[in-house]
Amino acid sequence: MASPTVKLNSGYDMPLVGFGLWKVNNDTCADQIYHAIKEGYRLFDGACDYGNEVEAGQGIARAIKDGLVKREELFIVSKLWNSFHDGDRVEPICRKQLADWGIDYFDLYIVHFPISLKYVDPAVRYPPGWKSEKDELEFGNATIQETWTAMESLVDKKLARSIGISNFSAQLVMDLLRYARIRPATLQIEHHPYLTQTRLVEYAQKEGLTVTAYSSFGPLSFLELSVQNAVDSPPLFEHQLVKSIAEKHGRTPAQVLLRWATQRGIAVIPKSNNPQRLKQNLDVTGWNLEEEEIKAISGLDRGLRFNDPLGYGLYAPIF
C-alpha cells in the first residue's frame, strides 16, 4: 500500500503519510526503515538532531540494493540544526548529512527551528544538541533571512529539491515570504487535537505551503522524556470521543487521529516499532471521517504544546 501524494509549490509530489525518525533507536533504525519500505512507506523524515541519519541511510541502501525501491521513488527529508544557521555553515552541514544518508540530494531540507545557536564544530560534538561547546545555551547572530538565502542556494546547487521550515509562527512565515526568492514548500509543526494551531494552519495553506504534522498522537511521544504537561494530559488514544469514532469506523484510535489530519490536507509522519501498526498508520487516506466528527475532534483543542524548549529546561521562549 502506497500513500497518496500532495503537490508541493516546488512542483514535486510528496507522500501524505511518511515515517518519522525522531527517537528511532540507532541499533534498530536500518531494519525499521527497510521494513517500512517493504510495507509501502516512501517518505522518511529525519534530522541532524535525531542522530540516526547514518543508520537510516543504511536501511535505504539495503532496500535499494535488494530491489524493493529506487532512489527516485523515495522522498527523503532532513533538517538544518540550529547550530548551523550562519550562511557559510549551511551548505557544508547539508553535504555532511547527505554523505551520512549516502545520497546525492534531499527531496526536502527544512530549517528545524527558527533559532540561531552558536556554532559547534561537528568534530567536537555531533549532533550538537542545544548546548554550545561551553555546555551552555548560547544564541548565534544569524538572521532567518541569512539562513534562508543559504537554503535557497542548496536548491540552486541541486543538493535539495525543495526547502521548508518547521516550528515557525505565522508572523515569521509572513516575514519570510516578503524576501524569499524560493518559497518554503512545507511548514512542519506540532499538530494534534490538543494543539490544533488553526490560524497558523489556515494561513500556511492559504499561502501555498503544505503543512506537515508531527506528534500527531499528542502527549504519547513525550511521556518517556518526562515532559510534565504530557504526563498530566489524558492520552488521546484513550479519549472517549476518539475511541467511539474509531469503533464506529472499525479503525484504531491512531488511524482516527491521523485521518483527522490527512482529510484536511495535512501530511503526517508517525512512527511505530510494531509491524501491524506500521501498516495501519499507512491506511489513513482511503476512508473518511464525517464533518461533524472532524469538528468534534478539533474541539479537543487545549493549546497544549509538548515540544517546547522551555519544557526541557532550555530558555528559548519561541512559542
Curated annotation (Swiss-Prot):
UniProt cross-references to Gene3D superfamilies, sorted A to Z: NADP-dependent oxidoreductase domain
Annotated keywords: Carbohydrate metabolism, Glycoprotein, NAD, NADP, Oxidoreductase, Xylose metabolism
Binding residues annotated for substrate, in chain numbering: 112
Organism domain of life: Eukaryota
Pathway the protein contributes to: Carbohydrate metabolism; D-xylose degradation
PROSITE patterns: ALDOKETO_REDUCTASE_1, ALDOKETO_REDUCTASE_2, ALDOKETO_REDUCTASE_3
Catalytic activity as recorded in UniProt: xylitol + NAD(+) = D-xylose + NADH + H(+); xylitol + NADP(+) = D-xylose + NADPH + H(+)
Record site feature (Lowers pKa of active site Tyr), residues: 79
Active-site residue list: 50
Record bears the keyword Repeat: no
Disulfide linkage: none
Pfam family, one: Aldo_ket_red
Residues annotated as binding NAD(+): 166-167, 215-224, 271-281
EC number: 1.1.1.307
Record: glycosylation sites: 26, 141, 167
Protein purpose: Catalyzes the initial reaction in the xylose utilization pathway by reducing D-xylose into xylitol. Xylose is a major component of hemicelluloses such as xylan. Most fungi utilize D-xylose via three enzymatic reactions, xylose reductase (XR), xylitol dehydrogenase (XDH), and xylulokinase, to form xylulose 5-phosphate, which enters pentose phosphate pathway.
Family matches, as PANTHER family: ALDO/KETO REDUCTASE
Name of the protein: Probable NAD(P)H-dependent D-xylose reductase xyl1
Gene: xyl1
